[in-house]
Amino acid sequence: LTTEFEIALTLLSAFIVATATMPVAKAASLYFGILARPSPDHPHDKPTALLGGLAVMAGFVAAIGLVGFLSRLPYHSIPWLAAFAIAMCLVGLLDDIVDLKPRHKLYLELAAISVLVWWGPHLDFFPYHAVNIALTIFWLVTATNAFNLIDGIDGLAGGVGIVAALSIATVAGLHQHTGTMVAALAIAGALGGFMVFNFPPASVFMGDEGALAVGLVLGVLSIQASNGGEGSLPARLAMPLLALMVPILDTLTVTVTRLATGNPVSRRGLDHSHHRLTRLGMSSNRAAVALIGLQVIAGACAIALSLVPGYDAILLIPFMALFFALVALFLMDRSFDAEAPGQLEDLPPIARVILS
């Protein structure tokens, strides 16, 4: 198969399968009562189906299976990725059904990710294997949960995921890493099918089973795309972060503000990036568009770094870091934390600096 045909077939097959199976997932969600009910965390008008992630995974697995069979590409770890994405999907499904405690969910994630890293892809940045393994596990746990945390308003997680997947696919394609490119295009196409049903007002949500699985897939593919390049170490380290910049920034700002104000990091709250933007007066739709636009900028930076030869990329990294640091500081505001334990002057000095 030609590369152009692989690209078109992957996107189209993933989109068609996800779109075709989404009504089935929605019907199953309604039948079994696996619903997101209206609450401060879910500000929608009526109970909404939560099993959209199952259809996303169906589209992803079907597309990589079809294209892999027809093109007979050496996919290496892609079958393992599909298997463990399904395993993570089951962890999320269990959470959607019984509402797991955060630490129990983390234990299950760590178990699945540790086995995946043992058998499959891992970072190859450093000469010490144990360091690469530990960093890979940390990155995949972070990426998996960070993506799950931005799934808070209609269209946001799906849109950010599509942009992230397309940027990863572009970087992988530039470095002739065809297996990674096909897998990234498959998740982008499947998320496109999901977005048909998730445009406001959404009739189905991704659910934890979808968000955790997609986050894991994007985390793994960002590693593979970075490993496939020949750029400098700083550029290769920056690429996965840029590919998932919006979820990472959201997790970073929420973690820092909660620690600074004495709140548990694992609590549920209305202090995520999309909540902060809506508190500024944006509609949910405009907040989603703004954050997706930020991910477009980050994805373009990832692609740009992959095109800059050798250590010349180091000249670009400080400017990118400054831009996203300013965005993070803009999002850190004590007024958004409804459960801050006291007045600003009562907080530790570091908290006063960050939150002023």
Predicted regions and their residues:
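Hydrophobic alpha-helical transmembrane segments
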Residues: E6-A8, A183, Y311-F319
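Cytosolic, membrane-interface loops and tails of multi-pass inner-membrane proteins
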Residues: P23-T48, T253-N285, P341-P348, V353-I354
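Transmembrane helix interruption/hinge and helix-loop junction motifs
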Residues: H175-G179, S306-D312
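Membrane-helix cytosolic exit motif
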Residues: L249-P264, L305-P309, F324-D337
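"…together with the soluble PPM/PP2C metallo-phosphatase catalytic core" -> "…together
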Residues: T2-T251
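Alpha-helical transmembrane segments of integral membrane proteins
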Residues: R279-I297, S306
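Alpha-helical transmembrane segments and their immediate juxtamembrane interface regions
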Residues: A87-L94, D312-I350
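Juxtamembrane "helix exit" motif at the C-terminal ends of alpha-helical transmembrane segments
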Residues: I64-L70, I297-G310
